[in-house]
Amino acid sequence: MLSPTALLLSASLTTLASAHFVLDWPVKRGFDDDKSGTFPCGGFDTPSSNRTAFPLSGAPIQLDMHHTETNVMVVLGVGNDPGTAFNIILRPTFRERGPENFCMGDIEIPASANLTEGMNATIQVVSNGDPDGGLYQCADITITNTPLTTDEVSQHCTNSSGVTTQAISNPGNANETSESSSSASGTASSSSASATASTGAAPLNSWSGVWALGAAALGGAAALL
């Protein structure tokens, strides 16, 4: 018979194994694997008081991936408590391959968001890792004009061996059925793109609206640093 300590360790390992992805940076609002399929923010509806200073000029998003292939997108909601209004796309849906550490580099805040230093917002990462729909995790941020140092970028941006990204033709939302992917893949460096309205996307779970395209990567693939 297992001791209480062994049972606790076993339960912890089971929880970790069943998680589909974990948002490591910026600091996540909260995580509960049983609620991670709840929109918005994996069931954590209340903004955190522990906000991450996020440079207007761009910063990485660090994920811990628990699948070998996942569709991912990144959206932004503006304000102290955006509720379900995540109406700015920071990264359109792309395919990530490889487990463990995955970094999206240079996630920029588009000028169309009209954010300035000291204003609050929330980043939401969406994936298709759940058989019944999407998975959602959020990070509450405060905008800053101060860029990250090289050491800070290195601390918050790591890719495991073999991790790649791939563009998706006609991408919808990451929580939808996968579309066929294009042949472009690899470790593309990021570039800025002008924000444009996108009305063709299907609703993100129960929410729908006009999305503005923020920073995009070369060839449609996510940036790896």
Language-model-derived ranges and their functions:
Residues 1-2, 24, 169, 201:
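Selective for proline/serine-rich intrinsically disordered segments
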Residues 1-4, 225:
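Positively charged n-region of N-terminal signal peptides that target proteins for export
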